[in-house]
Swiss-Prot record:
Gene Ontology CC: bacterial nucleoid
HAMAP family referenced in this protein's UniProt entry, alphabetically: RecO (MF_00201)
Top-rank lineage group of the source organism: Bacteria
Protein name, entry field: DNA repair protein RecO
InterPro entries, per database record: ARFGAP/RecO, DNA_rep/recomb_RecO_N, NA-bd_OB-fold, RecO, RecO_C
Keywords from the UniProt entry: DNA damage, DNA recombination, DNA repair
Organism ancestry: Bacteria, Pseudomonadati, Pseudomonadota, Betaproteobacteria, Rhodocyclales
Record's function text: Involved in DNA repair and RecF pathway recombination.
Organism of provenance: Aromatoleum aromaticum (strain DSM 19018 / LMG 30748 / EbN1) (Azoarcus sp. (strain EbN1))
A GO BP entry: double-strand break repair
Family: Belongs to the RecO family.
């Protein structure tokens, strides 16, 4: 980006904020057309700042910014409305989604489909069982980031996954039929793999096994570094 470039009316969500100097904030956002962007919100911590009541996580915003460095300058933010405030477990799950985006996405790498998946997940978190919502988002995240998560073809033979067979998932290879020396790897049924490929988490076994499989994959791509939000939610057994 050049120093003079300005972005206007960009749909975005706030992922994280932290204080900067005496009265300002650095705001990490996830935008539809520009991906994850860091912005300085000058004076946002002042009591009378127009930005103070707008820069909120999990709320759909329209944002204007300018600048060409790694950290841009926030010019304007407008609340778009329509998203209920998250509370309780739904709120903690929202923090989990945000942490995944901060840790796994690159700066200024646009993923419009991932943006829509994130917006959909936020809108659904307060309405019922959060587990299927989290699993769909995790799967979309890994696919959108180009990790090539194959689910419907066997990794060693390229044959269609058999719903009645048992598999282990080998990272960078895919599902392989379970053998005697595969102890220690999470097993997954062929039916679960096919359900995941179609985004169907209605079966209890699929929901249980997909949680273990997606955790294995996410931990790998995080380089084994723990997620703070997952530690907080461990006792709630939602992640």
């Amino acid at each position: 980006m050049s120093q003079k470039q300005r972005i206007d009316q960009q749909p975005a969500f706030v992922l994280h904020t932290y204080p900067w100097r005496e009265t300002s904030l650095v705001v990490e956002i996830f935008s539809r057309d520009h991906g994850r962007v860091a912005l300085v919100a000058k004076g946002a911590r002042r009591p009378m700042s127009a930005l103070r009541g707008v820069i909120m996580a999990f709320q759909p915003l329209l944002m204007d910014w300018s600048g060409g460095g790694e950290v841009k300058t926030l010019v304007r933010a407008e609340w778009r409305g329509g998203q209920p405030l998250l509370t309780g477990r739904a709120l903690m799950c929202g923090y989990y989604l945000n942490e995944l985006l901060v840790r796994l996405t690159a700066r200024e790498d646009a993923h419009p489909a991932l943006f829509e998946a994130y917006a959909d997940a936020l809108s659904q978190l307060g309405r019922g069982d959060v587990a299927p919502i989290l699993r769909r988002f995790e799967l979309t995240l890994l696919r959108e980031l180009g990790y090539g998560i194959g689910l419907d073809l066997e990794g060693d033979s390229n044959r269609p996954v058999d719903p009645v067979q048992q598999y282990v998932y080998i990272i960078e290879k895919g599902p392989v039929r379970l053998a005697g020396d595969d102890e220690g790897l999470p097993g997954v049924s062929g039916q679960t793999l096919l359900d995941m490929a179609h985004g169907d988490f209605s079966r209890a076994e699929t929901l249980f096994q997909s949680k273990a499989l997606l955790r294995l994959l996410i931990n790998h791509y995080l380089g084994g570094q723990p997620l703070q939000s997952r530690r907080v939610l461990k006792e709630l057994q939602e992640l």
